Structures are given as structure tokens and as C-alpha cells.
Design a protein with these regions (language model features):
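Alpha-helical secondary-structure segments
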Residues: 38, 111-118, 144-150, 200-201, ...
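Long beta-strand-rich cores associated with HINT superfamily self-processing modules
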Residues: 512-536
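Surface-exposed binding/hinge segments that line
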Residues: 87, 131-181
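Extracytoplasmic/peripheral linker and loop segments enriched in polar/acidic and small residues
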Residues: 95, 308-312, 316, 324, ...
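Ligand-site clamp/hinge motif
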Residues: 190, 219-265, 308, 397, ...
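N-terminal lobe/hinge region of extracytoplasmic solute-binding protein
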Residues: 40-90, 120, 131, 195-201
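Gly/Pro-rich hinge or "lid" segments in bacterial periplasmic/extracellular proteins
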Residues: 77, 165-227, 231-233, 360, ...
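Structural transition elements
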Residues: 316, 333-368, 386-390
Length: 536
């Protein structure tokens, strides 16, 4: 039996990510509206429904309105939120004691019925959040402030999953006919799409999609407020120049993200500052390994990527130092690991290069594989979602050309890009994986590196398959001993590295621009925690 106290001690498997996150002190006088934070982001949240879609912009806004049962502290260790205690009764069963005296923004009291209804809604087959709850077999309310969760089997990361599921108000859902989840990807909406009622530190008071969202402080919040904010005005400003102009003029106090090309300008402006941290998201290239034939290649009788030597050649031809030093202006560093150091399961050995940057060695590998003159191959990148992503992809095209690989580069808006990739129509593609909201290596292992099954390989359009890797991932998915589990995870990643099944590049740089009056935590999961934000 494991208690919350025991789990807290075991949380040493997570390095102190707080050392990488930054608290920036205020240095100038406060403006007249010191308690109103004006925040501009590059795009708008797609929905106010906490189970509508897990994308960073949604999570960054909604984590201030809704709360989970357990949350992460600044070191990415579990701490109490709407649950104050959690106990593992058996490898497949947990008991959670809920916080008393909590109310939703409309005044309804929080109790176990809300948790049962929320987990049922998140588990709905139509819910985009179903993957986070698929291991939950049943949830039972023992009393008003105690629940028990029965799992499908032994499962070590249920707390990680629960940390990403926000709790909704059962009475509010019943009243507004939104007990059943809707899927925005199918064009579906419900009352929860444009309205919200959580227990969090701020409540939604106004919502105009793609124009402005207004939050106001929740005076009845159960936790101790570290912020001094009364009101937040959130505006989507898509154009980089517009966003930075608003920051320079004082129209907004915080911009997320700050464009790489404007970092020096912001730093030179006395009233402004840059908050920077390495994102949890690792930028990597996915490879169409399992197809019989590539989509866009002059090799028609076989798939060059099916040969490990070809994959290694592509790996060794990339000058990561040049990419991070020049294109990304030294704001991040190369990585050879597929997960960030803050992610559960990371080991420093995973950031060891399986082979060095060596174009001449890459040419020899191609010749050994039967391609002394190289070959043509399709290569797709999105026009958005990655910092200087198009420039990086074009730089890699030039690097591969030096070894004879002619990458037929195409850039696409993100939506058609994603459709092409997931349909298996791309030979090489860029993917960013942050392992959120789970913050566990099982996320990328099971979703990206496991072969396709009903529960695995959702993001493996390249059809990479290794029976030994699959077996290790499956065992890690049910191993509850943390030491044994980490060994399985590291072993799986080492085999993936030896296969060159994916090509990690770097952790994305996460950059915020702010007035010097703003003090906040630049967290590597890219969420703005308004309850940890002050204006001075």
C-alpha cells in the first residue's frame, strides 16, 4: 500500500525542474491598473471545455479556471489540490480523500459526485481526453469526500493522468445539458464550449472567441493566493510584430511567446525583460519506416528508411550545434534524448549521442546501404508550432544534400500538415512531444514508439515496430515499482536510439516577453500560472 506521503518521497525521480524555471523580480513602478494583467498570446484557446482538446494554449488558460485532484509543484512533484490524500489500496485500486470547504465559482459545493461525473465525462468515447482515463474501469463515491478508483489493471501513472484532468461541477453540467463530452474536432459544441465553472483561482467573466477573454479573481478560492491580480484580459494577437508592438507600447504586460528575432530588442528595452526556459517539448523528426514504398522518392522497389544504416546516415548528417547556435540564437541546446530531463523516466545516459555529427561517415553508410549517389525523399514541416521551424527544416535540407539525400521539402499550415502526417503520407516529418499532461516517458513510448494497437501507436504514422521495444513498453505500463519501471523505460529508449527510429534535435526554447512590473514563473510545461503572478 502506498500513501501520498510515500509517493511524495519517491518523487525524487523527477529532477528539480524549478531550477530551470525562472522567477523574475519587479524593478519598476506600478502602472495605474496594477491589478489588471493584460496578456497577449499568439493564438486563442479553441474551447473553454476542459476536455475539449489538450493543446498548450487551452491548458495555459484553463489551468487558472479549473483544477485537478492532484497537481505538480515547481519541482514537478505531486502535491495536493482538490484531493488532499491518496492511497494505493492495491496495484489496481486507489482511494482519494477530497478537500472540504471548496466551492465552484457559482457557489455550488465541491464533493465526490463532481469527481465521478467529471471522470465519466472525460472517459466518454467521444471525449478527446479519453486516453488520459482509459485505464479507469470504475469510480465510486464512498462518501461525500472520498472516492475509490478501480483500474483496468496494475498501472503506475494514474496520478500523472489525474493531474491532467480538471474537475467540473456536476450540478452545473446537469443544468446546462453538458454531462456528455463533445469533440470540437467534429465541430461539436456544448454550453461548456464558451462558458466555464471551476474551482480555480480565477473565474471566467467574458468570452469573445478570437477577440478577448476576461477572467476575474475568485475571492473564495481555497488555496493561499501568491498573486495580487484582480482581473486578466487575454487577447490573441497572431502576428509577431503586432504582439511585440503591444508590449513595447505598454498596451499589454505579457506576451507568449516572444519571437526569437525580437529577444535582443526586448532585452535592450529598459521597461521590458525576457523570461526564458527550455520547453518540455523535444523537436524530433519522424520517419516513414514501415511503408513498403515511400510517398515521394526516386527509389521505387523498396523503402530506404527501412534500412537502419540510412536512418543513421540522416542522423549523422545533421549539425545540431549549428541549428541551435545560429537559427535559434543559442537559446537552447541540442539533445539526443527523446524526453526532457523533467519527465519521469529520464536518465542522463539517454542524452548521449549514439553517433557523432559526421557527414563523411553518413556518406559511407549510404554507400553500404546501396545508395552511393543518395536518393530523393519527401520532407514535410508545418508553417507554425515550432520556433523558426521552417528555417530549421530548410537548413536540414541543405545538410542532407551534402550527403546526397535530396529532400523534397514542403511546408504546410498546421492542420493540413497534421492530416498528411497522420495519414502516413509523409516520408519525414517534424514532431514536437512534451509528454503533457502526463509528464511521464510512457507518453511518447506508448503513443509514438510502440507499434499500432487499439491502445498504442496513436502517433506512430511511420509504423516503426520493434517487438522487443513493444514488450518493454508494455511492461513499463504496468510495473508499479519505480526502480524496476525506470530500468524498463531506459532500456526501451536505448533500443529505440540504437534503431535510429526517430531523430531528436533540441528542446524548443520557451520565451516570454514581459513588462518589468510583472513577476511570474516561466514553467517548462508552457502553462501560465496566474496564481503565481504578481504586478508591482
Amino acid at each position: 500500500m502506498a500513501s501520498s506521503r510515500e509517493i511524495g518521497r519517491r518523487a525524487g525521480w523527477v529532477p528539480r525542474a524549478a531550477a530551470a524555471a525562472i522567477m523574475v523580480a519587479a524593478t519598476t513602478a506600478a502602472p495605474a491598473d496594477a491589478k489588471t494583467l493584460r496578456w497577449a498570446h499568439s493564438n486563442d484557446a479553441t474551447t473553454m471545455d476542459p476536455y475539449g482538446a489538450y493543446i498548450p494554449v487551452n491548458a495555459s488558460l484553463l489551468n487558472n479556471i479549473y483544477e485537478p485532484l492532484v497537481r505538480y509543484d515547481r519541482g514537478y512533484r505531486f502535491e495536493a489540490s482538490l484531493a488532499t490524500e491518496w492511497t494505493r489500496l492495491a496495484p489496481d485500486r486507489w482511494r482519494l480523500v477530497l478537500r472540504r470547504g471548496v466551492t465552484f465559482h457559482d457557489g455550488n459545493p465541491f464533493d465526490s459526485g463532481d469527481v465521478v461525473a467529471s471522470l465519466k465525462r472525460a472517459s466518454d468515447p467521444n471525449s478527446p481526453y479519453r486516453p488520459a482515463t482509459q485505464m479507469i474501469k470504475d469510480v465510486v463515491a464512498i462518501d461525500d469526500h472520498t472516492i475509490e478508483i478501480q483500474l483496468q489493471g496494475p498501472y503506475p501513472t494514474i496520478l500523472n493522468d489525474l493531474a491532467g484532468v480538471y474537475i467540473m461541477d456536476r450540478q452545473w453540467m446537469e443544468k446546462n445539458d453538458t454531462l456528455r463530452a463533445v469533440n470540437p474536432a467534429k465541430g461539436e459544441e456544448s454550453f461548456a464550449t464558451r462558458n466555464a465553472n471551476g474551482t480555480g483561482p480565477f473565474r471566467l467573466t467574458s468570452r469573445r472567441p478570437d477577440v478577448e477573454t476576461v477572467l476575474e479573481v475568485n475571492p473564495a478560492w481555497w488555496d493561499k493566493a501568491e498573486h495580487n491580480l484582480e482581473r486578466i484580459v487575454y487577447r490573441p494577437l497572431g502576428a509577431d510584430a503586432t504582439r511585440i508592438a503591444a508590449l513595447l507600447s505598454g498596451e499589454v504586460h505579457l506576451v507568449t511567446p516572444a519571437p526569437v528575432q525580437d529577444v535582443d530588442r526586448i532585452r535592450r528595452t529598459p521597461e521590458l525583460k525576457i523570461l526564458e526556459v527550455a520547453d518540455l517539448k523535444v523537436a524530433l523528426f519522424g520517419l516513414n519506416i514501415g511503408a513498403a514504398q515511400l510517398n515521394d522518392s526516386d527509389v521505387k522497389d523498396r523503402n530506404p528508411l527501412a534500412d537502419r544504416r540510412v536512418r543513421q546516415a540522416l542522423y549523422q548528417a545533421i549539425d545540431r550545434e549549428a541549428i541551435t547556435g545560429r537559427l535559434l540564437r543559442g537559446l537552447t541546446k541540442p539533445t539526443h534524448a527523446l524526453i526532457a530531463a523533467e519527465i519521469q523516466g529520464f536518465d542522463p545516459v539517454l542524452d548521449t549521442a549514439p553517433a557523432p555529427f559526421d557527414p563523411e561517415a553518413a556518406k559511407r553508410l549510404l554507400a553500404e546501404a546501396g545508395y552511393p549517389d543518395g536518393f530523393r525523399i519527401g520532407f514535410d514541416c508545418p508553417t507554425e508550432r515550432f520556433v523558426n521551424g521552417e528555417q530549421m527544416c530548410q537548413a536540414v535540407v541543405a545538410m542532407w544534400a551534402r550527403i546526397g539525400v535530396k529532400a523534397a521539402y514542403q511546408s504546410h499550415p498546421y492542420a493540413p500538415y497534421l492530416k498528411k502526417v497522420l495519414n502516413g503520407q509523409s516520408d519525414i516529418y517534424i514532431l514536437g512531444w512534451a509528454n503533457t499532461p502526463q509528464l511521464d516517458a510512457f507518453s511518447i513510448l506508448n503513443n509514438v514508439l510502440h507499434s499500432k494497437t487499439p491502445r498504442s501507436g496513436t502517433w506512430n504514422p511511420g509504423k516503426y515496430a520493434n517487438a522487443e521495444v513493444d514488450a518493454l513498453i508494455d511492461r513499463a505500463g504496468s510495473e508499479v515499482d519505480p526502480v524496476a519501471r525506470k530500468a524498463l523505460i531506459v532500456d526501451a529508449f536505448r533500443k529505440v536510439q540504437a534503431d535510429y527510429a526517430a531523430i531528436p534535435l533540441y528542446r524548443e526554447p520557451l520565451l516570454y516577453g514581459a513588462r518589468r512590473t510583472v513577476e511570474t514563473w516561466a514553467a517548462p510545461d508552457s502553462k501560465i500560472r496566474l496564481w503565481l503572478t504578481r504586478m508591482n
